[in-house]
């Protein structure tokens, strides 16, 4: 889709888009503050006939099944779907990893090699 579709989605309360398709108007969409993770960009407009085939239904994206209630986290480098029943577990592990990487970053800034920083518990 393009900027108009993103604007419409945002105005309807959609917090972002994750698609295995392409998009156009990437700069305009970024200016909207509407995050999109997609397969790529394509400058040609989309077909005029857009049909909703489901809302709050399971979908497959990139070989991963996403079920309503799953937590989707994405940035410019990728996206991850966390099953609803594992959100707490995964977020605790992410906090542990972030704390470890923050410690490693400090050690590297102090001159330690990455190899040695990885060995520190």
Locations of regions flagged by a protein language model:
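Feature captures the catalytic cores and cofactor-binding loops of soluble hydro-lyases/lyases
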Residues: 1-68, 82-115, 119-121
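C-terminal binding/interaction regions
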Residues: 72
């Amino acid at each position: 889709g393009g900027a108009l579709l993103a604007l419409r989605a945002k105005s309807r309360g959609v917090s972002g888009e994750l698609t295995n398709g392409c998009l156009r108007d990437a700069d305009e969409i970024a200016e909207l503050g509407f995050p999109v993770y997609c397969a790529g960009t394509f400058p040609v407009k989309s077909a005029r006939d857009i049909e909703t085939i489901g809302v709050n239904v399971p979908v497959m994206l990139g070989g991963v099944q996403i079920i309503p209630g799953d937590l989707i986290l994405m940035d410019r480098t990728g996206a991850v779907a966390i099953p609803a029943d594992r959100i707490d577990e995964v977020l605790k592990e992410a906090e542990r990893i972030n704390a470890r990487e923050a410690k490693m970053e400090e050690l590297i800034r102090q001159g330690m090699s990455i190899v040695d920083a990885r060995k520190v518990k």
